[in-house]
Regions:
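Conserved beta-strand/loop scaffold segments within soluble protein domains that form the structured core
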Residues: 93, 97-98, 103, 107-298
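Charged, compositionally biased N-terminal leader segments and the immediate start
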Residues: 1-11
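N-terminal amphipathic, basic helical "cap/leader" segment at the start of enzyme domains
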Residues: 9, 14-136
Length: 298
């Protein structure tokens, strides 16, 4: 009989905790439901027309995209790491990841490996509020996303591009990407995340990103939201900052039928810099709602 401390026991332990997290999150969402205009922080945005439809929660299409189809959406004039998802599924062909002195890969790989156990226990799902129903929905159903860990004192020259591509090969799809980004002490990282639909089709992306900036860490995060006008994006970002850290989030909202940005900073020390910048350019039938929170815990 293999004990709980053996390799199989450790694997089952990780999967067991993840299963429990999913079940608990789903129970919270079922109790809370979707937010509505009755909620103070959602009084300007209604999801009623969106949630009345039926959606597929996973991609059934085996069709991928060619580099020529998406090349123009990358920042190609600079060297960079790339983590690319097509209809919520990781595309290794379009990606460039690394484990050389840092970890830039997919979250599912990190969750499945023993060497990331202590890091994930410390950070994963630790600053996501229990009363955010759409965050709970993401925790319950997410399958994939980006995992970025920059160790102490490491400052990579190349930025990281995270690309979420919706092809339109499958009508009415609901995507739940999840990103975990950790900048350890005295490290620095630049990240560009883009949401891009290729066809006019009904797609809802309920994205969640956790960012942890340890002491004296620097994070520059650029969000490019340029879906076509039939897409909905709900972007939930939770940022934990330790003393002397500096995190800047630059949000560019250009496309999509409905975009909702929930940006939350949690300052856990002194001499912290939290920068929020953005540009929103809309047409008459588009709706963008930015909701921000800066919580000074000390």
């Amino acid at each position: 009989r293999r004990g709980a401390g053996g390799p199989g026991g450790r694997g089952r332990g990780r999967q067991g905790r993840r299963h429990t997290d999913r079940k608990d999150a789903l129970k919270r969402f079922e109790k809370q439901g979707f937010p509505s205009k009755k909620d103070e922080s959602w009084k300007y945005t209604s999801l009623k027309s969106i949630i009345q439809k039926n959606y597929n929660l996973s991609s059934k299409s085996d069709k991928s995209v060619e580099l020529r189809d998406v090349k123009k959406y990358f920042l190609n004039d600079l060297d960079s790491f790339k983590i690319v998802f097509v209809d919520g599924i990781y595309s290794p062909f379009l990606s460039k990841t690394t484990h050389d002195g840092m970890d830039i890969c997919v979250l599912s790989a990190a969750l499945s490996k023993e060497k990331y156990k202590s890091t994930l226990k410390k950070y994963f799902n630790q600053i996501v509020p229990k009363d955010e129903s759409l965050a709970s929905l993401n925790t319950s159903y997410t399958k994939e996303g980006a995992y970025i860990y920059i160790p102490k004192g490491v400052c990579p020259e190349d930025p990281v591009q995270i690309m979420h591509i919706s092809t339109g090969n499958q009508e009415s799809i609901w995507l739940q990407p999840r990103n975990l980004i950790i900048a350890d002490k005295n490290s620095k990282v630049e990240i560009i995340e883009r949401h891009q639909s290729l066809k006019d089709h009904s797609v809802v992306t309920n994205s969640l990103t956790e960012i942890y900036a340890e002491k004296n860490a620097f994070v520059d995060y650029y969000k490019i939201q340029n879906d076509l006008n039939s897409a909905t994006l709900i972007d939930n970002t939770f940022i934990s900052q330790q003393r002397d850290s500096n995190v800047s989030v630059h949000t560019f909202s250009f496309g999509g039928k409905l975009t909702r940005n929930n940006l939350n900073f949690y300052q856990k020390g002194e001499n912290i810099q939290s920068t929020l910048k953005g540009i929103t350019i809309l047409e008459s039938n588009q709706h963008v709602d930015h909701n921000t929170l800066v919580n000074h815990e000390q």
